[in-house]
UniProtKB/Swiss-Prot annotation:
Keywords: Ribonucleoprotein, Ribosomal protein, RNA-binding, rRNA-binding
Family that this chain belongs to: Belongs to the bacterial ribosomal protein bS18 family.
Keyword DNA-binding: no
Pfam families found in the cross-reference section: Ribosomal_S18 (PF01084)
InterPro entries, per the entry: Ribosomal_bS18, Ribosomal_bS18_sf
Protein name as it appears in the record: Small ribosomal subunit protein bS18B
GO MF term (any one): structural constituent of ribosome
Annotated Gene Ontology cellular component terms: cytosolic small ribosomal subunit
Function (record text): Binds as a heterodimer with protein bS6 to the central domain of the 16S rRNA, where it helps stabilize the platform of the 30S subunit.
Designated gene of the protein: rpsR2
Biological process terms in GO annotation: translation
Length: 88
């Protein structure tokens, strides 16, 4: 019976890439406030969607904090919901 070819190991996730810069640390913030819409807009795309951790470079806890703040700001009508842009 022929042997199966040996599988090669996948490279480490950050082997050749530099780590993404943490946006909250670069802005000098420890906590996120839902009333600070200028800061929250950094974490929202042009379409109004929350940017992912891979894009923003946030930790898990920071991403949760930002997402909660954005959702609270949307409820208070400080930020738009996704899909409420200009329609053709």
């Amino acid at each position: 019976m022929p042997k199966k070819p040996a599988r090669t190991r996948r490279p480490a996730p950050l082997a050749g890439r530099a780590r993404k810069k943490n946006l909250l640390d670069s802005l000098g913030l420890r906590t996120v406030d839902y009333k600070d819409t200028a800061t929250l807009r950094v974490f929202i795309s042009e379409r109004g969607k929350i940017r992912s951790r891979q894009v923003t470079g946030l930790s898990v806890q920071q991403q949760r904090q930002v997402a909660t703040a954005i959702k609270n700001a949307r409820e208070m009508a400080l930020l738009p919901y996704p899909g409420q842009g200009i329609k053709p």
